[in-house]
């Protein structure tokens, strides 16, 4: 089986296929696994760990077509003229905000989708609110459940006349849940915040790598 998407859910899905006795592959468009949470060094180490589990990893692969295969049910054609045949494809390639109703109602939506909300999770119509993965806050869509919970608490407080209620962001820490592979990511993993400094701790013998970003 092939999982399209090398993020958290994609890797967990690939591990599930492997545990069922299937030959598992991960196909990722980016040059590394978990591209949002990890840098190049962390991604390389994770790839090694994942392949040690028996899951084959294919990065920098853009799927151009899925057609009937010759040795398997399906054939995935990639932009680099390579291909991969499989009987099963699982897509775990990110989220897309469900904002069709909001568009139909004339609410403000983002250029790439998502219902625009303010710090009180209120849309462009003061009588309509949005939370979770459909909400676009500060030009950002959150693809994790934790921010949705935080938004829900904020909105509940605001509806109960708490004038101090405000959504100011959420805990974006993530942890990969695979047997024998421990990966955690918190904060600004890529050090893109102005004034950030990267500090790296690497234990080659133990196969452990940790990056810490500090801000001036």
Q: Where would I find each of the regions flagged by the language model?
A:
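Beta1/beta-strand and adjacent pyrophosphate-binding region of the FAD-binding site
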Residues: 1-7
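Feature captures the FAD/FMN-dependent oxidoreductase FAD-binding
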Residues: 65-72
């Amino acid at each position: 089986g092939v999982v399209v998407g090398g993020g958290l859910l994609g890797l967990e899905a690939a591990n599930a296929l492997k545990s069922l006795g299937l030959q598992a592959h991960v196909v990722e468009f980016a040059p590394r696994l978990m591209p949002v949470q990890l840098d190049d060094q962390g991604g390389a180490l994770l790839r090694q760990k994942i392949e040690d589990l028996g899951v084959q990893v294919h990065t920098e692969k853009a799927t151009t077509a899925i057609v009937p295969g010759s040795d398997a049910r399906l054939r995935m054609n990639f932009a680099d003229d390579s291909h991969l045949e499989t009987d099963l494809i699982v897509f775990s390639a990110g989220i897309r905000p469900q904002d069709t109703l909001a568009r139909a109602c004339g609410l403000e939506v983002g250029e790439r989708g998502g219902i625009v909300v303010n710090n009180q999770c209120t849309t462009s119509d003061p009588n309509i609110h949005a939370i979770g993965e459909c909400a676009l806050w500060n030009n950002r869509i959150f693809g994790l459940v934790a921010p949705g919970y935080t938004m829900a608490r904020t909105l509940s407080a605001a509806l109960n006349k708490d004038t101090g209620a405000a959504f100011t962001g959420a805990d974006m820490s993530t942890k990969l849940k695979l047997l024998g592979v421990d990966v955690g990511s918190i904060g600004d993993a890529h050090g893109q915040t102005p004034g950030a400094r990267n500090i790296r701790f690497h234990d080659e013998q133990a196969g452990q790598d940790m990056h810490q970003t500090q801000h001036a």
